[in-house]
Amino acid sequence: MPMTLGYWDVRGLALPIRMLLEYTDTSYEEKKYTMGDAPNYDQSKWLSEKFTLGLDFPNLPYLIDGTHKLTQSNAILRYLARKHGLCGETEEERIRVDILENQLMDNRFQLVNVCYSPDFEKLKPEYLKGLPEKLQLYSQFLGSLPWFAGDKITFADFLVYDVLDQNRIFVPGCLDAFPNLKDFHVRFEGLPKISAYMKSSRFIRVPVFLKKATWTGI
């Protein structure tokens, strides 16, 4: 039986999960929920099902795999990664994955907070000012490695790709000063399963955020 991934019909938090499902050749189907237009941004399509799915902490995204029902995007990623040995093989690799997972969420939500804020135009310059320093840290962390944990890909690379790519959409050219990050971005998109997915009708690059965001990526 295929897994079911539930999320809004946007990129949001789901792209790393979608890409990991594709990369691992996992049989899955998507349940995409649509949010209504302004001014009410109706969420009834999700809310009508929210408490009927048997989820311990009902939220989007969710993943249903038989009797296993998960919410929280990183918990879902780790669940899938454990099935395929993509959590790091050595203690050093697992430490790097753990650090990245949490650091990326910090940086992800810094962008989210700017883009959903009614004070977007006031907050954007400060975000742009601090972005090069954040990217420099990722560049130093990667160094000359092909993947962020080491020689082999892990689920953390799916998170890094997503955060870097969202920032590329927000600030075109922001990776130009960091050749190893640009190379990583190209390397990731060049993975055969990822490349095929990105060419398919299932792939959602934008909108990055929901309609109620000030900046959605479109």
Swiss-Prot record:
One of its GO terms (molecular function) is glutathione transferase activity. It is an enzyme of class 2 (transferase). InterPro entries: Glutathione-S-Trfase_C-like, Glutathione-S-Trfase_C_sf, Glutathione_S-Trfase, Glutathione_S-Trfase_N, GST_C, GST_mu, GST_superfamily, Thioredoxin-like_sf. CDD domains: GST_C_Mu, GST_N_Mu. SUPFAM superfamilies: GST C-terminal domain-like, Thioredoxin-like. Belongs to the GST superfamily. Mu family. This is Glutathione S-transferase Mu 1. It comes from Oryctolagus cuniculus.
